[in-house]
Amino acid sequence: MTPTNHYAHIDYRKVIAWPPRLAREWTFLEQVFGAASPRRLLDLGCGTGEHARFLAGKGYEVVGVDASDTMLERAVEGGVPAGVTFLRGDVAQVDSVVSGLFGGAICLGNTLVHITEYDTLLQLLRGVRRVLVSGAPLLIQVLNYERLVATGQRYLPMSFIQDEAGESIFLRLMTHKPDGSVVFTPAMLRYRPDSEPALEIVSSHNVPLQGWRRPELEAALEAAGFATRVFYGTMADVPFVAGESSDVVIVAR
């Protein structure tokens, strides 16, 4: 992935309620990685490092890789506890960024859809396969674009953030294209309900994504050498239903 500043004005440490999210996901993460050997995990597209720090607190060594300088700066600001390493690099070339073998890998938070070409997706997955010990799991989570397109949904839930400068709104819009690509528009708005105008755009960018669906992901994983692939509908032991599930979650080995 090419580093961009699309998310430079968005502090994901603030716009996501991390403690309840991580607590909610832990049961599933433990189910997937509880037997990991070595207890060394790779975090692809680690962002601000919330999952890396959380998993380190559970006794894992975690190496987080991200192409964004801004994200990595915020990851370091959030703290680098023992057992955590953050590296700047292209996740599509992860096998040339990291060293050693891992007992598992995660690619969460809709990171994978920033890979917009199938050949690059395949390159990424093959690179991950090379740095995992035999049989180690790769956990992927992306939005279920099949459902989003079918229902015509073009936005994700808003977040309201209160800080010393006042109140802000984190808005995420989507435009789905016939070829499966997506124009994703994250925006930060300053909200002043007692002023005119009440809303001010702080930042707004169009981010090109590819809304990978289950069949495409399964084919790429198989081609990359992941012999088994189990699909879930969210970060829990819940079956995937194409027209209903919020997410496509995959455990591939």
Label each PLM-derived region with a short phrase.
Residues M1-R39:
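Conserved class I S-adenosyl-L-methionine
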Residues A52-V94:
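Class I SAM-dependent methyltransferase SAM/SAH-binding core
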Residues S96-G104:
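A short acidic, Gly/Pro-enriched loop at the edge of an enzyme's catalytic core
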Residues L122-S134:
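A short glycine-rich, Lys/Arg-flanked "PGG" loop and its adjoining helix->strand segment in the class I
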Residues P208-R253:
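C-terminal lobe and adjacent flexible extensions of AdoMet/dcAdoMet transferase-like proteins
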